């Protein structure tokens, strides 16, 4: 079952960020953070610095998208 991770870091341009992402392991959360920040701001992995990855409970999540994804019991593909 996936967990909710809060990924905290900054970029070499000085932008600080906190992302809430789903992942099985902390490595998965870091990869998702690299993907999201890189695509949104056109940055490479060397320009993104991850400072901390913390597991948080669904009640502590502020992202509505993450809360919704955690509430899904099953997915049916047609």
Swiss-Prot record:
One of its GO terms (cellular component) is ribonucleoprotein complex. InterPro entries: Ribosomal_eL20, Ribosomal_eL20_dom. Coiled coil: none annotated. One of its GO terms (molecular function) is structural constituent of ribosome. One of its GO terms (biological process) is translation. Pfam families: Ribosomal_L18A. Keywords: Ribonucleoprotein, Ribosomal protein, RNA-binding, rRNA-binding. Part of the 50S ribosomal subunit. Binds 23S rRNA. Belongs to the eukaryotic ribosomal protein eL20 family. HAMAP family: Ribosomal_eL20. This is Large ribosomal subunit protein eL20. The lineage of its organism: Archaea, Thermoproteota, Thermoprotei, Thermoproteales, Thermoproteaceae. The gene is rpl18a.
């Amino acid at each position: 079952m996936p967990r909710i991770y809060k990924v905290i870091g900054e970029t070499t341009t000085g932008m600080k960020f906190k992302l809430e992402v789903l992942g099985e392991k902390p490595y998965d959360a870091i990869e998702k953070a690299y993907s999201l920040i890189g695509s949104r701001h056109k940055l490479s992995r060397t320009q993104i610095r991850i400072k901390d990855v913390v597991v948080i409970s669904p009640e502590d999540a502020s992202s509505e998208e993450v809360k919704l994804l955690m509430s899904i019991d099953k997915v049916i593909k047609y």
